[in-house]
Regions:
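Conserved beta-strand-loop-alpha-helix junction that forms the acyl-donor binding cleft
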Residues: 91, 116-127, 144-147
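Conserved beta-strand in the GNAT
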Residues: 44, 50-59, 80, 85
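A short helix-loop-beta-strand connector motif used in the catalytic cores of GNAT acetyltransferases and
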Residues: 27-44, 62, 80, 137
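Conserved acetyl-CoA-binding loop-helix of GNAT-fold acetyltransferases
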Residues: 83-86, 92-105
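Conserved active-site tyrosine of GNAT-family acetyltransferases
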Residues: 130-131
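Conserved GNAT acetyl-CoA-binding A-motif
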Residues: 100, 107-119
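Conserved GNAT-fold acetyl-CoA-binding loop/helix
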Residues: 3-31
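Conserved acyl-donor/pantetheine-binding loop and adjacent beta-alpha core of acyl/acetyltransferases
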Residues: 56-80
Length: 148
């Protein structure tokens, strides 16, 4: 999955992404025995017994310094979806939607009041998915500057 995602993004933005090294990739991608806890979630989607996609998320606790922060969300538990991927053959078949909805339900059950994620701004697939399909709103911009 990481190889396919890396290849896709390397094609659309070769200066921002690269194809991951294949050696050791499978072992690095396998969830550990403690992948699902009260604060961490890994979901795997299958279609007709075949791997179709995955999602990784975590429950972020309220920040102790939230009263000093300008973002009110930081004072509450938040669901952070840090990885979502589906094989291209399963795009637009509801796999990613079901994964995100399951993660949101998991977060809600644990007290999360908001769900957050990040994605590549230049993606013609993920931006419409998150904004139009799932109802997420843009709230921040991540800036980057090479130092070497």
């Amino acid at each position: 999955m990481r190889l396919e995602n890396g290849s896709y993004y390397a094609r659309i933005a070769p200066t921002d992404f690269r194809i991951p090294d294949e050696e050791g990739l499978v072992e690095d991608s396998e969830p550990g025995a403690d992948a699902n806890t009260d604060t961490a979630l890994t979901l795997v989607a299958e279609v007709d017994g075949r791997f179709a996609g995955y999602l990784e998320a975590q429950l972020l606790p309220p920040l102790e310094s939230a009263r000093y922060q300008s973002q009110p969300d930081l004072a509450h538990p938040r669901l952070f979806i840090n990885a979502l991927g589906t094989l291209q053959e399963y795009w637009r078949r509801g796999v990613a939607t079901q994964l995100v909805e399951a993660a949101e339900a998991w977060g809600r059950e644990r007290g999360a009041l908001v769900s957050i994620c990040d994605t590549y701004v230049g993606s013609p697939v993920s931006i419409p998915f998150w904004e139009e399909r799932m109802g997420y709103e843009r709230r921040a911009v991540i800036l980057r500057k090479p130092l070497a």
